[in-house]
C-alpha cells in the first residue's frame, strides 16, 4: 500500500497497538517482519501508521504474537479496513490536524465523558460560546478560519444529537458555568443549552460546586473516549505544551478512577439541573 504523507491519530493508534502486541510477545521487529514475510523497515512503517494494511495482515500479525483476544483483533481489523469518509475530512488542510483527529475519535467512540473546570465542554457549546472562545486568542484568527473552527465544533455534536447518539457524561465545575464567554444573554443561552441537552436519556450532566470541602481535583480536567474494547480507549488532557493523547492501559485506568472520584463528589443529575437553572436566573 502507498505511504501516507500524514497518518491520522487513529491510523497511528492501530500501529501502536500492534507494536504493543509484538512487544508483549517478546518479539524483535525483524522476527515479526520475518513471520509476515517482509522486512523490518516495512514493519516499522506499519507500526508508525505510515502505510495501511489488510485484514489478512492484521490477523497474521496477531497470530504471530499469540494474541487470543478475538474482540481486540476484530477491533484492530475494523480500524485497518474502515474506508468511511467522515464529515470532518472536508476540513482537511483548512484546520489543524488535531481538529480532524478528535472528530474521528468521537465518531468511533462507544461512549464519551468530560471533566471541565474552565470552559463548558465542546459538545455542549453553543455557536456564540464557541465563537467567543476561538476569538479570544493572540494573534487573532482570520475570520474565515474562525468560522471554520466554530462550524467544526458544531458538527462534532452529531455524536450526541444525531441519529445514533452515544452515551455522554459531563462533569462541569461551577467556575466553567459562571465564566462569561460573551455577554449576559449569551451566557444564559449557554446554560439553557446545557439544560436542554441534559434532558436526553443518553446524556448525564453533573455540577462540581465551589463549596465542596477538601476538593483537590481541579487538575483533573479530561476528555475521554471509550473504544470498542477498553484497550482502545483514549483520553485527551491539556498540558503546558498542548493537548496530550493518552492511551496506555495503566494511565487510562488511573483516569477512570479519577473520573469516578470527581463524579462521587459532584451533584446528582437532578440537583445539577436545578443548580444550573438557578444560576441562569441569577445572571
Where are each of the predicted segments found?
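C-terminal regulatory/effector modules of DNA-binding transcriptional regulators
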Residues: 164, 171, 181-283
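Interdomain hinge/linker segments and adjacent boundary elements that couple functional modules
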Residues: 2-16, 20, 24, 29-34, ...
Amino acid at each position: 500500500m502507498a505511504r501516507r504523507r500524514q497518518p491520522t491519530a487513529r491510523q497511528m493508534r492501530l500501529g501502536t497497538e500492534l507494536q504493543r502486541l509484538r512487544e508483549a510477545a517478546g518479539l524483535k521487529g525483524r522476527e515479526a517482519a520475518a513471520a509476515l514475510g517482509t522486512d523490518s523497515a516495512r514493519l516499522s512503517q506499519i507500526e508508525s501508521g505510515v502505510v495501511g494494511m489488510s485484514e489478512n495482515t492484521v490477523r497474521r500479525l496477531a497470530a504471530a504474537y499469540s494474541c487470543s483476544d478475538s474482540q481486540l483483533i476484530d477491533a484492530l481489523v475494523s480500524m485497518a479496513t474502515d474506508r468511511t469518509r467522515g464529515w470532518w475530512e472536508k476540513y482537511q488542510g483548512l484546520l489543524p490536524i488535531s481538529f480532524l483527529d478528535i472528530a474521528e475519535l468521537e465518531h468511533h467512540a462507544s461512549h464519551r465523558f468530560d471533566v471541565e473546570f474552565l470552559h463548558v465542554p465542546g459538545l455542549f457549546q453553543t455557536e456564540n460560546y464557541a465563537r467567543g472562545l476561538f476569538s479570544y486568542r493572540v494573534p487573532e484568527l482570520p475570520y474565515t478560519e474562525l468560522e471554520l473552527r466554530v462550524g467544526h465544533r458544531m458538527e462534532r455534536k452529531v455524536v450526541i444529537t444525531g441519529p445514533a447518539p452515544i452515551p455522554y457524561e459531563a462533569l462541569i465545575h461551577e467556575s466553567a458555568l459562571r465564566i462569561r464567554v460573551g455577554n449576559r444573554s449569551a451566557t444564559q443561552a449557554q446554560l439553557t443549552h446545557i439544560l436542554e441537552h441534559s434532558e436526553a436519556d443518553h446524556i448525564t450532566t453533573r455540577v462540581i460546586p465551589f463549596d465542596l470541602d477538601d476538593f483537590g481535583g481541579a487538575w483533573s480536567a479530561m476528555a475521554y473516549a471509550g473504544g470498542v474494547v477498553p484497550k482502545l480507549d483514549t483520553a485527551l488532557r491539556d498540558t503546558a505544551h498542548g493537548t496530550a493523547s493518552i492511551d496506555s492501559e495503566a494511565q487510562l485506568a488511573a483516569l477512570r478512577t479519577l473520573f469516578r472520584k470527581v463524579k462521587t463528589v459532584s451533584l446528582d443529575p437532578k440537583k445539577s439541573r436545578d443548580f444550573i437553572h438557578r444560576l441562569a436566573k441569577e445572571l
